[in-house]
Amino acid sequence: MGTPVNDKIDKFRNVLHTGQVFSLEETRDFAKWLAGLRDRKAKAMIADRIKRAANGNFGTYRSVQGGVFELKIDHGPGYRVYYFQRGKQLIILLCGGDKRTQQADIAEAKRLKEEIERRGGNETF
């Protein structure tokens, strides 16, 4: 099991969904954030983490509010990837950030999720 970040934040969980495969879609915000990272090792670690999640191995993650989840990547400034799950097999990558911008990133992820749901999710993200 993961450990709590502090007393106010949910515990991180490690989950392996054996045999479960997820489809991934990303928002423009997420793609722009990832493309803007200069740290090549971080990019590789994030890409690997997303690939593992698509194969059912979410590793360390937690619910942050309103159906938005956070993948924690233990590298550099503490990178985070925010996503939500639509149905049983679709993961939508909303945005990314690091520990320093965590609260603003969570608010943005919630806003993006609400926007996608309001539109019905039938448009390009």
Q: Can you say where each PLM-predicted feature lies in the sequence?
A:
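Basic, Lys/Arg-enriched alpha-helical interface segments
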Residues: M1-G78, G87-I91, D98-F125
